[in-house]
UniProtKB/Swiss-Prot annotation:
Keywords: Prenyltransferase, Transferase
Source species of the chain: Aspergillus ruber (strain CBS 135680)
EC number: 2.5.1.-
Enzyme class (EC, first level): transferase
Protein name in the entry: Echinulin prenyltransferase 1
Binding site for dimethylallyl diphosphate: R90, K179, Y181, K248, Y250, Y333, Y398, Y402
Biological function: Prenyltransferase; part of the gene cluster that mediates the biosynthesis of echinulin family alkaloid. The pathway begins with the biosynthesis of the cyclic dipeptide cyclo-L-Trp-L-Ala (cyclo-TA) by the NRPS echPS via condensation of L-alanine and L-tryptophan. The prenyltransferase echPT1 then catalyzes the first prenylation step, a reverse prenylation reaction at C2, to yield preechinulin. Preechinulin is the substrate of the cytochrome P450 monooxygenase echP450 that catalyzes the formation of the double bond between C10 and C11 to produce neoechulin A.
Keyword Transferase: yes
Pfam families: Trp_DMAT
Amino acid sequence: MPSEVLTSYYDYPTHDQEAWWRDTGPLFGRFLKGAGYDVHTQYQYLVFFIKNILPSLGPYPARWRSTITPTGLPIEYSLNFQLNSRPLLRIGFEPLSRFSGTPQDPYNKIAAADLLNQLSKLQLHEFDTQLFNHFTNEFELSKSESESLQKQGGINGKSTVRSQTAFGFDLKGGRVAVKGYAFAGLKNRATGTPVGQLISNSIRNLEPQMHCWDSFSILNSYMEESDGWNEYSFVSWDCVDIERSRLKLYGVHNAVTWDKVKEMWTLGGRIENNATIKTGLELLQHMWSLLQINEGDRDYKGGFAADNGGKTLPIIWNYELNKGSPHPAPKFYFPVHGENDLQVSKSISEFFTHLGWQDHARQYPHLLRQIYPNQNISQTERLQAWISFAYNERTGPYLSVYYYSAERPPWGSDQVK
């Protein structure tokens, strides 16, 4: 495998980079191979990983617990599945440095700025930093706000959102498409400005170029009515020309029940008569029934699944805003971290069969074993963390699986289970 070749011959500049590579690099290589990337493209993306992601993982093991994964790891691999195409590999990533969480950089701003600067030098296809700069200006703490938050006690243990920004990388066609993420929680704590107001202000300022305010207003009306905004809400965008980018709003909800999912999918009934929304809801309900998720109110308070077994993870919601679209497009992330991995893989395979995706249905359980050859998936419960689903009229169903993304168990545990 290409990752094995690089492990043997690459001279890593620091011990931390070598340790992170051994923990995340071969696994990344197995994801590339399992998803069907050719050998040339595997090398291409592995080199991108080594040159750009590895130096931004910071000290090993990580001292900063990232908000982007259930275990606090700063990196997450995911696979997207659609009709008549091989899986698409993505990387979610919060850059870290030796200063992250220290008095020099208590809220981890330095590493993100350094990585953005590095990406700007790579001449990535259609890469644009306008929206990244916009949202970091809107949500990142100023010096005075950081000092104010420190006086309030800073980040309170493990129970509060710690991250301010993150990146996503879609690996398709030999290219790297970059996404940005900005979290509103710390700004809310430092300033007292409600999260919904912070997000509304940031989007209103983009209206002359993005023309999505009407769609956002439908979403915001529902969020205000249902008290849906909270410290875990965040914004995402494509790092392309501002007039072509999508915006996505994310958040969590502890009511893991079908009634709440249906309510949120239809924005409290506001878009329930739309044919695409109806079709998507029917498919979503079928996936829900296959996964057999235990219904109830979760006690998620911002901790990490490595500490609580994963059974308290909430639902994640996501609404996409597109230029000229009359309403937001919903996506839901069902928590499966803490559920038996073999059973989850069988449920995913059954759902693929229901969709008529026979190749994906046949290959998925084998793919999971190929990615984690040293794990007995009939015994593990933490390899698959989330399953997301969306539906639109043009491309049909759209399903992604998010995975535990390191070779070693999280935070010094003796086993991944």
